[in-house]
Amino acid sequence: MKSFFNNKAQTLINLEIKKGKIPKLIKINFNDYFKNKKKFLNKISVLFRNKKIIIRSSFSNEDTNRSSNAGKYESYLNIKYNDVNEIDLKIKRLSRLKNQIRGENFFVQEMVKDVSFSGVVLTRNLENYTKCININFFDGKNTEAVTSGKTETKSILFFENDRFKIPKKFLNIYLCVKEIIQFTNEPDLDIEFAVNKKGLVSILQVRKIVIPKKYKKINLDYKNLFLN
């Protein structure tokens, strides 16, 4: 069976969810861009009119079924939609992060506005690979705080059970994660998200957690645990 996970951009393009949203994006081939910059810069300015954008890698060795290379490549945030010089500069810089860009892609995506908190949710505890809902988050506008390792980040660890519910703050994220699991038919996920002040969840990235073939399994004798 073919994996749902191809590369960062295509995974988001293929994903269909109702419990959250995928910020508008366009995937562009590096070779196509450098052959006709004017065409693509104009396309970006029209598609993201009056918006701020983020330029992100979508290389073939990222977010596949076998490896993630999470955090290996830089993203460029808060660029004005019509600042063609800055957009071109960042695309050039991104292209230099890989030795060979033939057949490789990047994507441009709308920045999420009015962010209340953001972070990463895992469906496994990466220390022992126990199944759970592990949410690492940052209260504030910085959507890269968790992935960049800022010390102000917080975490909760929730084990699904019949007695206790996940805190209301994280309910929409939880529902969105369950929907993505069902859509992708993949229970082991690493998902980047941002939640705005109205509680709307934006999904920024979805990758498969690569589970080692051998790891020490732990049998839990408790049903609910929160770590703050």
Set out the residue ranges of the language-model regions:
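Flexible beta->alpha loop and helix N-cap segments adjacent to enzyme active/binding sites
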Residues: 68-90
